[in-house]
């Protein structure tokens, strides 16, 4: 669904969106937008009135959306042209194709221009199925909240995006080898909720404003070390996994109440708390 159900009622400064293959080069996005357009019989063209365009504030693509236009799975959909909907602040992508509650296939999206196509997005939700790699790359100056859920253990997230305004991140899935530390991607994040099979790839040292951290390791492998020494503003920490003999490094300036809680939980789990 696209957010035209909630029209703003006003007029935008920009002109109407004229539907053509130059503006929307991807055939699946073209057909999707066409369903919202009006037909200009005088010029034999489709267009979306600017008042309706201004009312589009969210964009939701489910698994069935593009498959009804002939997508057979595996392709990377290009969202070029969606930047014309300049008021979109929320984007949800379900990269699965469901029939009768069963996943029948998956699709992906072109990542290198994604944040150019949605230049004002604040909330991003992505759900994927299968062994494909989902990429978050480029730069977003508006993004504030990120949710990525990978249903298949063979899938991975390659996160190299620069999004300095993000405050909340929830990721469930494996990180790809080329992923950057979360502190590079989301340096001002205050809340991180990470569930992954490769917890050693989770580097939060650059998240200096981090207040809430939840780490869950989905394997039964030993966790060597978790470094929280640079996260001096932490107020809440929960770590789940095989913590026996794990070294958890914390700042000497960490909240005293939190330190006491960590001492109890680490002792019970057989982990070691180290202050730096």
Where are the model-predicted features located?
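N-terminal capping/linker segments that flank leucine-rich repeat
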Residues: 7-175, 179-187, 193, 247-276
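Tandem repeat domain/solenoid detector
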Residues: 122, 142-144, 165-167, 185-191, ...
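Bacterial N-terminal signal peptides
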Residues: 1-6
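Predominantly soluble domains enriched in secretory-pathway, periplasmic, or organellar proteins
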Residues: 139, 179, 183-184, 203-205, ...
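Leucine-rich repeat domain C-terminal region
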Residues: 226, 235-258
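Extracellular beta-rich repeat passengers
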Residues: 208-209, 218-219, 228-233, 250-253, ...
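Extracellular beta-helix/beta-solenoid repeat scaffolds
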Residues: 90-92, 98-99, 120, 212, ...
């Amino acid at each position: 669904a696209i957010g035209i159900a909630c029209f703003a009622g006003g007029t935008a400064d920009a002109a109407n969106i004229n539907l053509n293959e130059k503006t929307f080069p991807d055939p699946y996005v073209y057909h999707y937008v066409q369903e919202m357009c009006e037909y200009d019989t005088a010029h034999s063209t489709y267009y979306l009135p600017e008042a309706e365009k201004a009312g589009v504030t969210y964009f939701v693509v489910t698994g069935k959306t593009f498959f009804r236009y002939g997508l057979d799975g595996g392709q990377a959909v290009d969202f070029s042209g969606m930047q014309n909907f300049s008021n979109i602040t929320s984007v949800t992508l379900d990269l699965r194709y469901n029939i009768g509650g069963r996943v029948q296939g998956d699709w992906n999206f072109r990542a290198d221009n994604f944040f150019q196509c949605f230049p004002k997005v604040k909330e991003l939700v992505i759900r994927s199925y299968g062994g494909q790699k989902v990429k978050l790359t480029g730069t977003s100056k508006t993004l504030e909240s990120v949710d990525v859920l990978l249903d298949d253990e063979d899938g991975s997230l390659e996160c190299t995006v620069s999004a300095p305004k993000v405050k909340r991140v929830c990721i469930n899935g494996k990180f790809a080898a080329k992923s950057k530390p979360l502190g590079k991607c989301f340096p001002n994040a205050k809340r991180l909720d990470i569930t992954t099979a490769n917890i050693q790839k989770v580097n939060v040292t650059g998240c200096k404003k981090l207040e809430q951290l939840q780490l869950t390791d989905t394997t039964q492998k030993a966790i060597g070390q978790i470094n929280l020494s640079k996260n001096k503003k932490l107020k809440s920490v929960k770590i789940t996994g095989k913590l026996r003999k794990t070294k958890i490094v914390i700042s000497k300036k960490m909240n005293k109440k939190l330190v006491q809680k960590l001492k109890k939980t680490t002792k019970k789990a057989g982990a070691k708390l180290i202050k730096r």
